[in-house]
Structure formats: C-alpha cells, structure tokens
Amino acid sequence: MASFAKLNSENIVITVVSVVNEVIKDSNGVEQEQLGIDFLKTLYNEPNAVWKQTSYNTRGGIHSSGGTPFRKNHAGIGMTYDSNRDAFISPKPFNSWILNENTCLWEAPIPMPTTELENNQFYSWDEENQSWNLTTI
C-alpha cells in the first residue's frame, strides 16, 4: 500500500489515505508519486487538492524495514509538510523544544533519562521547570 497525505492551504495534513501500489506504478512497473496524486484527485473529484506521498515505515528519517526513508516522518493529521525540508513535521509539543534538522523530530532541551523503568512508570516533560518528571501510574 502507498500512503498519501492531503494538505490544506497552509500545508497542514488534513487526511491520510492508502492506495494499492498498482495505482502508482507506471507502464514499466516503477512507482510514481504523481500517478497516485492524479488518482486521488480524480477519485475525490478535487482537481485542485494537494497530495503528498508519505511512507508508513519512515520515522525520524529512518525506514524501519531498512528501505529508503521518505519525507523524514510518516504524515499524520495535524502535521505540517515543510517543502524546504521535504518533510512532515509534528506540531511543536513545548515552546522550549528544538527541531532536529536531521530527523525533523522535536527534542527537549534536556535529553530524557535513559534509566530502565518499571512497567507502570514513564517520564513526562515539565515545561515550567525544564525537566523530566518520573511518573508512576
């Protein structure tokens, strides 16, 4: 399956759909993004819609199956497509977080602790104190 993200006028992802791979293959069997875009514009009768292909297996610029990463991250509703970076970027979670230009993922100004946690524990970011808090549920 091939995934495509539909963008609004501000390049925000408003929907993500999948199409069978055969839809995006040309006469030589080579996948072409434009074929998928044309298919979706016709299917939804939206000739002016903006669609971008996205890879379900890509996160942080790494393809989970060892394939070629595509557009840094799999698109999700509410994410932004950045044409300069050719990447999908999640909304900034906290004002202090910084975009990693290589992964297009947001990072806290202080790395999350790497200590091993129990099953009922997790770390959460405390923006006011600029620190990670260990929480037990």
Where are these regions (language model features)?
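Interaction-interface detector
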Residues: 1-137
